[in-house]
Amino acid sequence: MCHAAPARPGDGRGLPRAGDNFSGAARSKPVGAAFEQRARQFLERRGLVFVAANVTMRGGELDLVMREPDGMLVFVEVRARRSARHGGAAASVGWRKRRRLVAAALQFWARHGAGAACRFDVVAFEAGQLAWLRDAFRADDA
C-alpha cells in the first residue's frame, strides 16, 4: 500500500518564534490548528494538494490528508514541541500513535483512495524549526 519516498528537509518559513509558548490544555486546540495550517501551507507550496483535515475515523484522527501530483495519498501527522527535550516533536509519534494513525488511514483509504498508493509523513515543529519527514513510517511498522 505505502512506499518510500526520498527525504526533503523543510525550509522553516512561517514558523512560530522559538520563545512562543504553545503548551497548556487551554491553548492546545487553537495552537494545534495553527500548526496544522502552517504545515498545510508548507506542503501546498511544495506541490501537494489538500484533501482533508482533522478527519476522525474509528481508531484515530488524521491531522492532514494531502495528495501528491502523481495521485499518492499522504497522511500527515503534525507535531509541535518547544524543545528537543524528551526526544522532540518527531519522536513523540510513538508506536501507539502510529498504530492509531494507520488504523484511521486504512479506513480513509478504503473509502476515498483505494487503488492509490499512500505514505505517512510527519511535519514536526521544534524550537521554531520545521522538519518534513517524508515516509516517516510504514503501515507495517505500526
Curated annotation (Swiss-Prot):
Signal peptide: none annotated. Coiled coil: none annotated. This is UPF0102 protein Bcep18194_A3391. GO terms for molecular function: nucleic acid binding. It holds the Pfam family UPF0102. Residues 1-27 are annotated as: Disordered. Gene3D superfamilies: 3.40.1350.10. Belongs to the UPF0102 family. InterPro entries: Restrct_endonuc-II-like (IPR011335), tRNA_endonuc-like_dom_sf (IPR011856), UPF0102_YraN-like (IPR003509). It comes from the Bacteria.
